[in-house]
Swiss-Prot record:
Residues 1-15 form the signal peptide. It comes from Caenorhabditis elegans. Coiled coil: none annotated. PROSITE patterns: THIOL_PROTEASE_ASN, THIOL_PROTEASE_CYS, THIOL_PROTEASE_HIS. GO terms for biological process: proteolysis involved in protein catabolic process. This is Cathepsin B-like cysteine proteinase 5. It is an enzyme of class 3 (hydrolase). Belongs to the peptidase C1 family. Residues 16-81 form a propeptide. The active site is at C110, H286, N306. InterPro entries: Papain-like_cys_pep_sf, Pept_asp_AS, Pept_cys_AS, Pept_his_AS, Peptidase_C1A, Peptidase_C1A_C. GO terms for molecular function: cysteine-type endopeptidase activity. The keyword RNA-binding does not apply. It comes from the Eukaryota.
Length: 344
């Protein structure tokens, strides 16, 4: 039965047609918002406090969006019972990381954020809640750099390399700049917005520099566990199949995954609904965490956690059409399995 449902949903997704307009790719600002809201009814665009020039600093070079080669894909199994709706927050409600929206601020660290978020989730899930913590995006961002490593810090990085780094070097704990949670919390403060009643200073003119890699805890709360003893490791890192059912099976079985996609100007104007690219030029690449899926008025979607704080989108989340590889989101999924025995 689920296969028939899947076929019908893919057909529904394929039937989504956005009326073309020869000037749509060049639209910007209010003209873009007006066009998006008149051209389709799946999602709503609205004015954002942070301008486009600042949003681009949160993105990474599109060179980091290379789709996986078929021979590199490991996770290809398909479950016999895929539900129409799934939300990891409901499936594993006791895992603190799953419902946590982070803020990458003025740095293209999305690749490290999405990895740290999904790895935190999977560690909690695999341990049945025994290891329930937030793992550090800062540890990845600052230390997994260089030509033969993840990439270039705040300029972007390869998601699969972040997961391989976790397998080889492990990740320490670390939460947000605001909470100073764990061994190595994020060191770049939020900027240019009011979030949860706190007004942060204006963002700097230039992209924040990549934090320096240090092999010690940096929390201002004087975290007691030494850096090397705080490491959490993975046993495997791999690419996930490009088919919808393969991605769903991986999430059902092991938890949220990391994906990357092309961001167009209309995406950052997203406020609610099921996103489908409608207008505006390409701005760069972005990595995020998929934690579920569903159907909204017949339109299948992925449920995704962004890292632009809770003031953006649907309280930090967004939904994007499922089954069309929208903006490349279904061809770059990566994941891994925690090594609980190796946990320090």
């Amino acid at each position: 039965m689920w296969k028939l449902s899947a076929i019908l949903l893919v057909a529904a997704a394929s039937a989504v047609v956005i009326p073309g307009h020869r000037e749509a790719p060049a639209l910007t600002g209010q003209a873009l918002i007006d066009y998006v809201n008149s051209a389709q009814k799946l999602w709503t665009a609205g004015h954002q406090v942070i301008p486009k020039e600042k949003i681009t600093k949160k993105l990474m070079d599109v060179k980091y969006l290379v789709p996986h080669k078929d021979e590199d894909i490991v996770a290809t199994e398909v479950s016999d019972a895929i539900p129409d709706h799934f939300d990891a927050r409901d499936q594993w409600p006791n895992c603190m990381s799953i419902n946590n929206i982070r803020d990458q601020s003025d740095c293209g660290s999305c690749w490290a954020f999405a990895a740290a978020e999904a790895i935190s989730d999977r560690t909690c899930i695999a341990s049945n809640g025994a290891v329930n913590t937030l793992l550090s995006s800062e540890d990845l961002l600052s230390c997994c750099t260089g030509m033969f490593s993840c990439g270039n810090g705040c300029e972007g990085g390869y998601p699969i390399q972040a997961w391989k780094w976790w397998v080889k070097h492990g990740l320490v704990t670390g939460g947000s700049y605001e909470t100073q949670f764990g061994c190595k919390p994020y060191s770049i403060a939020p900027c240019g917005e009011t979030v949860n009643g706190v007004k942060w200073p204006a963002c700097p003119e230039d992209t924040e520099p990549t934090p320096k890699c240090v092999d010690s805890c940096t929390s201002k709360n004087n975290y007691a566990t030494p850096y090397l003893q705080d490491k959490h490791f993975g046993s495997t890192a791999y690419a996930v199949g490009k088919k919808v059912e393969q991605i769903q099976t991986e999430i059902l079985t092991n938890g949220p995954i990391e994906v990357a996609f092309t961001v167009y100007e209309d995406f950052y104007q997203y406020t609610t609904g099921v996103y489908v690219h409608t207008a505006g030029a390409s701005l760069g690449g972005h990595a995020v965490k998929i934690l579920g899926w569903g159907v909204d008025n017949g339109t299948p979607y992925w449920l995704v956690a962004n890292s632009w704080n809770v003031a953006w989108g649907e309280k930090g989340y967004f939904r994007i059409i499922r089954g069309l590889n929208e903006c490349g989101i279904e061809h770059s999924a990566v994941a891994g399995i925690p090594d609980l025995a190796r946990h320090n």
